[in-house]
């Protein structure tokens, strides 16, 4: 079976064939200068139509033709009835061209593609191996991750999985803020308390989060401590830039608290099925940041204020607020080091993707402006902004210690998953340990799906019941896969040859049509940086399979050829579902 005759994207190939036929028909009768747009409606309201196009309606005025007559001419001249995969073409209403696909041929094409490509089905060569750096999560290492960080991590992780799947050379990075004021507060408190060890059984990020909260309270009560912390920060930066040995004790405190918090973050992210390829430290760019400041001063675009601080005016970029590059004592700020970090990334990748909270929009505008001043193309930085998650429990604040940690959130999800399983009678025959494992995977799938299915630019009003619903949430998708695997286990037979002509009932064909669109949804997710596109597709696919499962018998069919064809359809669904769930990071469960 040659790859040339087995398309990676059967639906798009079919659409292209139909569009070409329609364009050729129009060009053969009318003089049209430009490439004709042929919009396709994938959900036409006409009974019996799988696709439709209003192309005649949009062209009629330009060609001075009656739209219905134009549509009939297009159908007649294009011989759409003879186009491969099209069974019938006809005109309805004022000029809509409706198309019914040849179910047998289209089913054969789609299933051939799924079985030929297997675990690669859905993957298109969008990236052509080009190097990309994708940065996500990058939470301050001064306490545990909270659910907002979880949204960042899930969005970034799904985009990374999809970009790797579509042949981008992706390196996933976590930018570690190891020299900001918050870390200085934590390092100061750590030294003050005598460098305490993390108690056995306690996560390091939780322990240091408590220390940080205590430090914040002490500084709030005694504002003079602010200067002590500032001295800590200045000493650490001098250590990094000038290798000043007298600050080794302070530097060691900074590095210890950062590494310990980061260790806790990694544990949480692993549970959420999120991984990073590289951890890049802000402190690595302390010297580079100073060089950038000098360069901007030499270029005449930055200036030193009377108090000694260096600033750059961004009014030419429509930004009223000037950007401060250094403090009056000459030390750099996070923004300056972030500029250095992005220059470093751009030197190593075709383009960069950053996943950031919506509150970073001004900072990104400033970053783009300075990069443009430095003659770097800011369009090579693609930023995915996301809004916040609102929990029933209320707001989160790492500063005062009032927040819901991501660990607590995942534990709550697991507890509720166990309760849902018990209420639904799921996995009753299994041991407590096995049920715990299934509950954990249901919880992770539920949380990831609940985050993924909402467009990043919209806030999430988190609903526990909906997230863990076996009819709407992540478990709904896992259950579809488990049902399919159950059918194949019970059948206990290997089907090598089958006739797709036996898959012509409405429910089977709807499932086939839905599966044929998987590659296109992956591509849209990557191009638009929208995990919600893929998540919604996953829900629709699962819903279609559940309907098929309930309406179409597979195991108890007298006709062997029908049974074999339906078994292959179920097997094809497990391939698509597993590929899809892997991209979304949703655990696959063979039994539920």
Swiss-Prot record:
User: What EC designation does it have?
Assistant: 6.1.1.19
Gene Ontology terms, MF aspect: arginine-tRNA ligase activity; ATP binding
Record-level GO BP terms: arginyl-tRNA aminoacylation
Q: What are the record keywords, sorted?
A: Aminoacyl-tRNA synthetase, ATP-binding, Cytoplasm, Ligase, Nucleotide-binding, Protein biosynthesis
Kindly state one GO CC term assigned in the UniProt record.
cytoplasm
Query: Where's it found, cell-wise?
Result: Cytoplasm
> Record's InterPro entries?
aa-tRNA-synth_I_CS, Arg-tRNA-ligase, Arg-tRNA-synth_N, Arg-tRNA-synth_N_sf, ArgRS_core, DALR_anticod-bd, Rossmann-like_a/b/a_fold, tRNAsynth_Ia_anticodon-bd
Q: Cite a single Pfam family from the UniProt record.
A: Arg_tRNA_synt_N
Q: Which reaction does it catalyse?
A: tRNA(Arg) + L-arginine + ATP = L-arginyl-tRNA(Arg) + AMP + diphosphate
Q: Where is this motif: 'HIGH' region?
A: 139-149
Q: Which residues form the signal peptide?
A: none
Q: Which PROSITE patterns match?
A: AA_TRNA_LIGASE_I
Which family does the record claim for this protein? Belongs to the class-I aminoacyl-tRNA synthetase family.
PANTHER family to which the protein is assigned, alphabetical: ARGININE--TRNA LIGASE, CYTOPLASMIC, ARGINYL-TRNA SYNTHETASE
Q: What is this protein called?
A: Arginine--tRNA ligase
**Organism the protein comes from:** Methanopyrus kandleri (strain AV19 / DSM 6324 / JCM 9639 / NBRC 100938)
Lineage, top ranks: Archaea, Methanobacteriati, Methanobacteriota, Methanomada group, Methanopyri
